[in-house]
Amino acid sequence: MPKYYCDYCDTYLTHDSPSVRKTHCQGRKHKDNVKFYYQKWMEEQAQHLIDATTAAFKAGKIANPFAPKPGAAIPPPANMQGPPRPVPPGPMGPGPNMLGPGPMGPMGPMMMGPNGPIRGPMAGPIMGPMGPMMGPMGHMGPMMGPIGGPMMSPMRPIMTNMPQPGQPPRAKE
């Protein structure tokens, strides 16, 4: 009677009947051996791909993906340029660490959330209980300005004689 040889397990089965083969193939050791065989095969394929890519790169057939590309570079966003600017003093005078939005904006660093970018809280005295430059909030709560811009309060009066952030100070008349 012919015996059945299992390549994965490197063993001969006692009989060549379908029921013996089925029982063997459902066994834990056989399944582990099959899993190990294909893991080893995948590692060999990955190493072969790495070796082929390295050889092609050394031969000059593949361009360096980390080399700077010719052409214009995209400038960083406006809120990422330059040092932090001082914020004009409010009715109570300038407080400690009252600097305008710096490289991370007034609300801290940007993080990617499931629905797009979100801002994290910024540690330090700049974001106290009332936040920077915020007056009484009233019943409506704070309103957000443009992304990277300061928080606005609906009850705060507008000061027209103050220069806008980023503008030079006005000359006295």
From Swiss-Prot:
Mind telling me which GO cellular component terms the entry cites?
A: commitment complex; U1 snRNP; U2-type prespliceosome
Top-rank taxon, per record? Eukaryota
Q: Could you tell me where this protein is found in the cell?
A: Nucleus
Biased composition regions of type Pro residues, renumbered to the chain: 73-94
Q: Which UniProt keywords apply?
A: Metal-binding, Nucleus, Ribonucleoprotein, RNA-binding, Zinc, Zinc-finger
Quick check: keyword Nucleus in the entry? yes
Task: Please tell me whether the keyword Ribonucleoprotein is annotated for this protein.
Answer: yes
Zinc fingers, Matrin-type, are found at 4-36
One record GO biological process: spliceosomal snRNP assembly
Q: Where is this region: Disordered?
A: 72-100
InterPro entries in the record, alphabetically? Answer: Matrin/U1-C_Znf_C2H2 (IPR000690), Matrin/U1-like-C_Znf_C2H2 (IPR003604), U1-CZ_Znf_C2H2 (IPR013085), U1_snRNP-C (IPR017340), Znf_C2H2_sf (IPR036236)
Q: Which GO terms describe its molecular function?
A: mRNA binding; pre-mRNA 5'-splice site binding; U1 snRNA binding; zinc ion binding
This molecule's function is given as: Component of the spliceosomal U1 snRNP, which is essential for recognition of the pre-mRNA 5' splice-site and the subsequent assembly of the spliceosome. U1-C is directly involved in initial 5' splice-site recognition for both constitutive and regulated alternative splicing. The interaction with the 5' splice-site seems to precede base-pairing between the pre-mRNA and the U1 snRNA. Stimulates commitment or early (E) complex formation by stabilizing the base pairing of the 5' end of the U1 snRNA and the 5' splice-site region.
- Tell me which family the UniProt entry assigns to this protein: Belongs to the U1 small nuclear ribonucleoprotein C family.
- Quaternary structure (record): U1 snRNP is composed of the 7 core Sm proteins B/B', D1, D2, D3, E, F and G that assemble in a heptameric protein ring on the Sm site of the small nuclear RNA to form the core snRNP, and at least 3 U1 snRNP-specific proteins U1-70K, U1-A and U1-C. U1-C interacts with U1 snRNA and the 5' splice-site region of the pre-mRNA.
Annotated protein name in UniProt: U1 small nuclear ribonucleoprotein C
Q: From which organism does this entry originate?
A: Pediculus humanus subsp. corporis
